[in-house]
């Protein structure tokens, strides 16, 4: 089929397409007509490069919700055919749902559509059959909040190709490591409908952002692996919504001639089914998911389907990849090879390595999977390169041929007194459903555990990493310092001991204590108190101190950093002339002195009383001292309060670090309210920096803001340069699920992600990182009973807040909202006694720390030489926000170059150990 141009026109053409009109075909222009000509308008030349724009106008103040649609009423699709849709989009206001929709496919990707013209692409496959299928194609916006424009839309027939290697064909979502095969149909991936195992869906079943089925219908997948035979398998099916009759999962090993039911689903939770032995061995497995006893109200949506299987033959290491081409032109339309990093070999064997136990070193930037390949390369020692007062990390990995037990690693000797070395065991978490196309089902490392947390067993053929973190003292002098690690373990023939040499090269400068990159991460002390069973204010303060210390060691400031609030005492508040305000700062000042000053933090959030702090789900009325907004006395009281807050923070020397936030993630319907809030703060306390997390990027329509904090894919707006010019700070945040090709914070993402986030921050002149929470350990969507919360060690998923377990499930991603873990003694919050131990860190938090320290190298170098060529981030590290290297080598090499340059520029200093205090 030739490429089809989608031509949109106004409602004047709608009458031409009644039920009896001939369906438009391949070489005919497809005509889209508006559902509401007063709100869907053609704007000549308003698109990119002078193209016409097809615009939807919504009213952010309207409470009415509904669809505004541009559609081609009748399109003829060939059966069993792949198609792609490409359209330029400029979504000027967030808060709505943009939907690309027909009978085969329903694509929602609203959070990734942004201000400024950019191209959106998606794929789908039509139902099998012998006859052409006539249906509409729709571009819709639900609950439109403003202006959204489309241009240059086109529909093309596609031809998919899958990676062929070693006689095996694997596509995106598939992986074979050793003799283990995995498949995840990540539905956030625009190529999910072009995955190799997807065979067909019947009428009523649609692919897209979620598998969406109503009435009687079915989805069918077929799994083959060349000439290999399947030996065993299990499948996980995860509904997000399930209403009506039973949905059953069936498998066939004879191409669908006979079926075996392996499970049934009656509620919206993750369902895992093991396939019965009588299906094996076999060359192919066909899976069918269908609704039985359907009625008009039947509905099911799936967020993911995952299959794990063992196969025969020689072991392999292969990640699948998919490319889809436009059939008529041969041009590449989309591609996905997001899992390639999982098959790479890295690291080097150490002298202690033997036939029965491989001992090897790996960069901290590589996640060591249990099935990691042992490297062929060798090295004489583990080498750390760092400055005085700076932490640096590496991994020590053990891969035995037979089971070993109770590995313990300790420092036997070291030449540099005052150096601290943490040696933590990496704990694996079973990921059954991936966050996005970067991940794979299996065991992923994350929590960093004390070595005495339990008795460790390492199975033969599997790898176990230890995370090493070394930090020289402030007064350490330039040089190379040698040391030895002692390793003890129990093998099949008893206790064993071996030595592992290491060295620390200390650069000729000292790392600063208070850093340049602002970080502010949410900490929920209510969750901490619940898990630890804190019984008193003293318990809560002890825990706060320990949690803040662990996070500050990775340069993370939290919001809040104190449980204390200034106490306001009003007298005569109803008397405009006699009103007085006294603020008791005692407890607040005590905590700020201990935590903000003592931990050398570089920013803190101050929560303003009376301003009506809100978010897009919860609007709160501004009230201070019982006086509501609208009362003439309200602004007088707020003015007195804000003036005193600024005066006190200036007096204490904290004014440069403070910022305030009045509204979280406002949409256009909230802009007027946000303008009022921040203008009030600016009027009476102008030195309090005012932060906003805009859902559609920096936007000067909102006045009073001087810290803009968008998500990365909403950073580049037309107002961004203007914000910079007037001196505003630019921070950013990641939340829930950034697109899978962007750096994220999830457990099942490449190890470098959180480190490269700081490199991209420097590259984009971003000066702050924000994250919503570090200890979201349980969510009501997955764990509705508050007395039986989630154990984050056993379930890595970040579950949503809303509890509708029988009909809906909402999950954000693996590790979402979680950078630290509770102690094992209170991991499920079901113990009776109070636990006062501090939290356990995570691999991801440590890599975030390394990125923050890399950022400081850039900042130090810029202070010494503002035009230095090394201040440019190499393209070998990151080319675009959605195109970065998953190999940490280029980052590590550039960091060393910067260190050498800083040393060179500091030559002549008599005491380089104290230059950067």
Language model: regions and residue ranges:
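Catalytic domains of carbohydrate-active enzymes that cleave complex glycans
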Residues: 173, 178-186, 323-338, 609-674, ...
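Extended acidic/polar, glycine-enriched regions
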Residues: 296-299, 399-407, 413, 455-514
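Extracellular beta-strand ligand-recognition surfaces/modules
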Residues: 85-87, 121-153, 277-297
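Short carbohydrate-recognition loop motifs
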Residues: 43-65, 199-215
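Aromatic-lined carbohydrate-binding surfaces of glycoside hydrolases
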Residues: 444, 452-453, 470-471, 481-489, ...
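Exposed low-complexity, polar/acidic, P/S/T/G-rich flexible segments that act as propeptides
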Residues: 147-167, 292-338
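Extracellular ligand-binding interfaces
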Residues: 62-128, 144-146, 239-263
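Surface-exposed binding patches on compact interaction domains or structured appendages
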Residues: 339-378, 391, 401-468, 476
């Amino acid at each position: 089929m030739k490429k089809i141009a989608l031509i949109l026109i106004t409602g004047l053409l709608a009458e031409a397409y009644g039920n009896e009109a001939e369906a438009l075909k391949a070489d005919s222009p497809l005509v889209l007509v508006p559902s509401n000509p007063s709100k869907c308008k053609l704007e000549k030349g308003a698109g990119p490069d002078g193209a016409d724009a097809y615009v939807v106008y919504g009213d952010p103040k309207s409470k009415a919700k509904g669809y505004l649609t541009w559609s081609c009423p009748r399109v003829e699709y060939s059966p069993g055919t792949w198609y792609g849709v490409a359209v330029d989009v400029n979504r000027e206001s967030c808060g709505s749902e943009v939907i690309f929709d027909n009978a085969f496919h329903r694509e929602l990707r609203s959070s990734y559509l942004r201000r400024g013209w950019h191209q959106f692409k998606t794929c789908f496959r039509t139902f099998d059959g012998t006859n052409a299928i006539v249906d509409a194609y729709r571009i819709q916006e639900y609950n439109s909040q403003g202006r959204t424009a489309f241009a240059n839309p086109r529909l093309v027939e596609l031809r998919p190709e899958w990676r062929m290697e070693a006689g095996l064909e694997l596509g995106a979502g598939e992986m074979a490591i050793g003799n283990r095969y995995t498949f995840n149909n990540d539905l956030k991936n625009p190529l999910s409908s072009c995955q190799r195992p997807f065979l067909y869906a019947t009428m009523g079943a649609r692919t897209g952002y979620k598998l969406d089925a109503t009435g009687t219908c079915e989805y069918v997948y077929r799994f083959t692996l060349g000439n290999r035979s399947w030996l065993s398998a299990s499948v996980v099916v995860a509904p997000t919504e399930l209403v009506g009759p039973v949905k059953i999962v069936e498998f066939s090993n004879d191409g669908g001639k006979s079926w075996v039911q392996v499970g049934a689903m009656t509620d919206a939770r993750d369902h895992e089914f093991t396939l019965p032995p009588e299906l094996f061995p076999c060359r192919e497995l066909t899976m069918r998911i269908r609704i039985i006893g359907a009625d008009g109200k039947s509905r099911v949506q799936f967020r993911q389907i995952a299959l794990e299987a063992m196969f025969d033959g020689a072991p392999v290491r292969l990640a699948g990849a998919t490319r889809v081409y436009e059939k008529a032109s041969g041009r590449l339309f989309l591609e996905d090879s997001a899992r390639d990093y999982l098959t790479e070999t890295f690291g080097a064997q150490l002298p202690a390595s033997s036939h029965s136990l491989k001992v090897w070193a790996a960069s901290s930037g590589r996640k060591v999977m249990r099935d990691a390949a042992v490297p062929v390369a060798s090295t004489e020692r583990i080498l750390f390169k760092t400055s005085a007062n700076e932490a640096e990390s590496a991994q020590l990995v053990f891969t035995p041929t037979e089971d070993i037990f109770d590995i313990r690693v300790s420092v036997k000797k070291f030449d540099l007194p005052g150096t601290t070395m943490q040696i933590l065991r990496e704990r694996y978490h079973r990921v059954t459903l991936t966050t996005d196309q970067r991940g794979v089902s299996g065991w992923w490392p994350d929590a960093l555990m004390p070595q005495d947390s339990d008795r460790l067993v390492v199975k033969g053929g599997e790898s176990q990493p230890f995370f090493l973190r070394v930090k020289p003292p402030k007064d350490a002098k330039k040089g190379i310092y040698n040391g030895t690690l002692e390793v003890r373990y129990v093998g099949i023939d008893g206790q064993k001991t071996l030595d592992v040499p290491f060295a620390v090269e200390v650069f000729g400068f000292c790392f600063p204590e208070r850093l340049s990159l602002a970080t502010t991460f949410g900490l929920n002390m209510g969750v901490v108190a619940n898990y630890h069973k804190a019984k008193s204010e003293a318990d809560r303060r002890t825990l706060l101190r320990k949690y803040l210390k662990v996070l500050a060691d990775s340069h993370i400031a939290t919001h809040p950093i104190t449980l204390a609030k200034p106490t306001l005492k009003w007298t005569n508040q109803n008397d405009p002339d006699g009103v007085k305000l006294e603020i008791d700062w005692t407890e607040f000042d005590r905590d700020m002195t201990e935590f903000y000053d003592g931990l050398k933090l570089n920013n803190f959030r101050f929560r303003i009383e009376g301003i009506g702090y809100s978010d897009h789900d919860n609007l709160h009325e501004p009230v201070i001292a019982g006086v509501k907004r609208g009362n003439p006395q309200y602004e007088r009281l707020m003015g007195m309060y804000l003036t005193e807050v600024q005066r006190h923070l200036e007096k204490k020397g904290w004014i440069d670090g403070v910022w305030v936030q009045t509204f979280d993630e406002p949409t256009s319907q909230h802009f007027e309210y946000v303008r009022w809030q921040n203008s009030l703060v600016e009027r009476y306390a102008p030195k309090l920096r005012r932060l906003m997390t805009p859902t559609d990027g920096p936007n000067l329509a909102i006045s009073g803001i001087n810290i803009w904090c968008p998500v990365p894919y909403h950073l580049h707006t037309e107002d961004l340069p203007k914000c910079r010019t007037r001196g505003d700070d630019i921070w950013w945040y990641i939340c829930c699920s950034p697109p899978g090709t962007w750096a994220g914070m999830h457990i099942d993402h490449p190890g470098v992600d959180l480190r490269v986030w700081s490199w991209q921050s420097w590259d984009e002149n971003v000066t702050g990182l924000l994250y919503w929470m570090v200890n979201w350990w349980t969510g009501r969507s997955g764990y509705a009973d508050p007395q039986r919360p989630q154990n984050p060690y056993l379930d890595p998923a970040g579950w949503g807040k809303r509890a509708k377990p029988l009909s809906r499930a909402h999950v954000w991603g693996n590790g979402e909202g979680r950078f630290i873990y509770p102690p094992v003694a209170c991991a499920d919050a079901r113990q009776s006694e109070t636990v006062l131990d501090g939290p356990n860190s995570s691999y991801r938090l440590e890599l975030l720390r390394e990125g923050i320290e890399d950022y400081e190298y850039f900042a130090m170098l810029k202070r010494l030489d503002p035009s230095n060529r090394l201040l440019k981030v190499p393209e070998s590290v990151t080319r675009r926000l959605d195109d970065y290297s998953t190999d940490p080598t280029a980052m590590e090499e550039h960091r060393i170059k910067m260190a050498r340059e800083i040393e060179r520029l500091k030559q002549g200093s008599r005491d380089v150990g104290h230059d950067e205090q």
